[in-house]
Design a protein with these regions (language model features):
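Conserved structural motif at the start of ABC-family nucleotide-binding domains
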Residues: 7, 22-24
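ABC ATPase nucleotide-binding domain helices that frame the ATP-binding cleft
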Residues: 46-49, 146
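Non-catalytic connector elements of ABC transporters
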Residues: 251-327
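Helix-to-loop junction immediately C-terminal to a conserved catalytic motif
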Residues: 53
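The feature captures the beta-strand-to-loop junction immediately N-terminal to the Walker
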Residues: 38-40
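Conserved ABC transporter NBD signature motif
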Residues: 61-70
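ABC ATPase nucleotide-binding domains
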Residues: 76-82, 86, 90-230
Length: 327
């Protein structure tokens, strides 16, 4: 692969008629990192990805730079970016190898080099035995690997993912997420990955940019986003939270994660509560504990522990577990 580059966005924004899809923002994607754009539907993450790719233009005076080159006015075919879509965007009349080779053929890459690159990419995504298979004979996961191989074959400066795993079943999605993460680390290519799935974001991102209503609301490492969320929206969107203190005057409320609650079936902890329900999650269980607030809090416990509805408990928080936000 080519040497990794930095991607810099300066005062980029996008408005469609009277609707603001993306408020002005500055953002830098470091060379060789995977930056995940995370947020709910309609938050502006795909618009931002399309601006980076050249499929959309930023409203003036927004600029996009690849290292020291201003690519703002360049269309997608001049930016040398690779894109992987949710719907694969493969050609059904071409076989696996022909799909991977298509972009190289359009670029005028000589046949010998083209064949060598196709072989290299198919080996990279473990599809060599399927080189001559028809696209309609592939599974969803295999199709997404073909799409990834095709994007990488042109040796792009930047690799862009638009929710590539959203259409797959849960088990396949988990496996491909691991494979894509390992591949991105191995290639050390600059990548931007769009998703609404916080587990995907945590697993793949070197950093995560959380977006809300067209705004970038927090940019941090996965650990920073989860452990030090900048707002209640971020805390709520990335994992579960409990409200453990109400303040009707609008002062900061206190929250905690389900795994940060200490629980005992005796009186060792200062706070009291009652188990009102539980959900089995495989290796763990999620308990609902009534602590006298409007809603019960959630507590994460090992699945082998036995807790009964109606059981009285004591509880506390791990040190420095509480989060505070102004609401």
């Amino acid at each position: 692969m080519k040497e990794a580059i930095n991607v810099t966005l300066r005062h980029c924004s996008r408005r469609f008629n009277q609707q603001v899809a993306l408020h002005p923002l500055d953002l830098r994607v470091h060379a060789g990192e995977t930056l995940v754009l995370l947020g709910p539907s309609g938050c502006g993450k795909t618009t931002l990805l399309r601006i980076i790719s050249g499929l959309e233009s930023s409203d003036p005076p927004g600029e996009i730079w690849f290292d020291k080159r201003n690519v703002t006015a360049l269309p997608i075919e001049k930016r040398n970016v690779g894109m992987v879509f949710q719907n694969y965007a493969l050609f059904p009349t071409l076989n696996v190898a022909q799909n991977v080779a298509y972009g190289l053929k359009v670029q005028g890459v000589p046949r010998a080099e083209r064949e060598a690159r196709v072989a290299e990419m198919l080996a990279l995504v473990d599809l060599t035995p399927l080189a001559h298979r028809a696209i309609d004979k592939l599974s969803g996961g295999q199709k997404q690997r073909v799409a990834l191989a095709r994007a990488l074959a042109a040796r792009p400066k930047v690799l862009l993912f638009d929710e590539p795993l959203a259409a797959l079943d849960a088990r396949l999605r988990d496996r491909l997420r691991l494979e894509i993460g390992a591949l991105l680390k191995r290639l050390a290519i600059t990548a931007v990955y769009v998703t609404h799935d916080q587990q995907e974001a945590m697993a793949l991102g070197d950093r995560i940019a959380v977006m809300e209503q067209g705004r970038l609301v927090q940019l941090d490492t996965p650990q920073g986003i989860y452990q030090r969320p900048a707002s209640r929206f971020v805390a709520d969107f990335v994992g579960a939270i409990n409200c453990i203190a109400h303040d009707p005057t609008g002062q900061p409320l206190r929250f905690c994660r389900p795994e940060d609650v200490l629980l005992a079936d005796d009186t060792r902890y200062p706070q009291r509560g009652v188990v009102v329900g539980s959900t089995f999650l495989g290796a763990s269980q999620r308990l609902l504990i009534d602590i006298g607030l409007d809603s019960p809090i959630q507590v994460e416990r090992h699945a082998r522990e036995i807790w009964q509805a109606g059981q009285r408990i004591s509880w506390s928080l791990t040190s420095q577990a509480a989060l505070e936000f102004s609401c």
